[in-house]
Amino acid sequence: MQYKQLGKTDLQVSRLCLGCMTFGEPDRGNHAWTLPEESSRLIIKHAIDGGINFFDTANSYSDGSSEEIVGRAVRDFARREEVVVATKVYHQVGDLPQGLSRPLILRSIDDSLRRLGMDYVDLLQIHRWDYDTPIEETLEALNDVVKAGKARYIGASSMHPHQFEQALRLQKENGWAPFVTMQNHYNLIYREEEQEMLPLCYREGVAVIPWSPLARGRLTRPWGETTARLVSDEFGKTLYSETEENDAKIAERLAFIAEDKGVSRAQVALAWLLSKPGVVAPIIGASREEQLQELIEAVDVTLTREEMAELETPYKAHPVVGFK
């Protein structure tokens, strides 16, 4: 495994972050395809054994059970100081409504720490932009969470570049803890972030940790092949349903290059993303140990300039999606 500094922090993180939305009791939350604790622990242990030290969960994943599972597994399989644990706040969980008001943030971090069984998280991220709360209120509350020692750093996720720029400016002007990461929607078939968000992050020294690096599985298998999760993934359909014809052309080239190199489609798609300036650690998901191992090995795959161009040439502008 390779490691890289997470933006302007002192954290050294693995080049892959294990996304933990897959982990959670299936009868809790909105996803019936999540893995129960016993199966989840096998994946988390394999990740740690494979050198992954960066884990991303959220208060809302499976009604909080993802945090519970991740916390127990990390305590059993690693020392706390050896791992970087990130969680999020915004979406509704239990009787805690959606939002980023000061009371919601302060209660949410306490609930997350209780579920994780930890004194602090390394990274607390706002899951989305809250249009119903003044951003100043949100940013000051996040700063107080950092000052209280409950989160070492804060990050953001999926918002418009002008919103992120405004937040960074307000943090500087008020001496508040800055956003050090941007968790955004970025992969071979969705590259709209290259227009404004990625240059902004690069200029400000903000680490990019993309979600859906494999387009929710679309870049891992023959185009058009379905899975149970793909069929039931209503959010995923909102991301890619309008651009399938163009995306299929990119997937064809991906398959050709993967076959030519003797590696998998997923490994090529991750290698492409890992080569992008500012991208520190794509957030991967896995439901089987062999699947995770395949992704871990992607870190050692390199692409030539010609292969990069071959993958990128068919891309056409997409509707901006993923902010809700």
Question: What do the PLM-derived regions correspond to, one by one?
Answer:
Residues M1-V83:
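N-terminal binding-site loop/beta-alpha segment at the start of enzyme catalytic domains
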Residues A58-E67, Q92-V93, D130-P134, P161-H162, ...:
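Acidic-and-aromatic substrate-binding clefts and catalytic sites of carbohydrate-active enzymes
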Residues G24-E38, Q92-P103, D132:
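Active-site mouth loops of central-metabolism enzymes
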Residues L18, T57, T87, L123-I126, ...:
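Conserved beta-strand positions
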Residues R114-T133:
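Active-site groove signature of glycoside hydrolases
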Residues W33-A47, L100-L116, F164-R169:
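Short, acidic/polar
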Residues T133-T313:
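Beta/alpha (TIM)-barrel catalytic core signal, keyed to glycine-rich beta->alpha loops juxtaposed to Asp/Glu
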Residues A73-E82, R114-G117, V146, L168-N174:
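Acidic (Asp/Glu)-rich catalytic clusters
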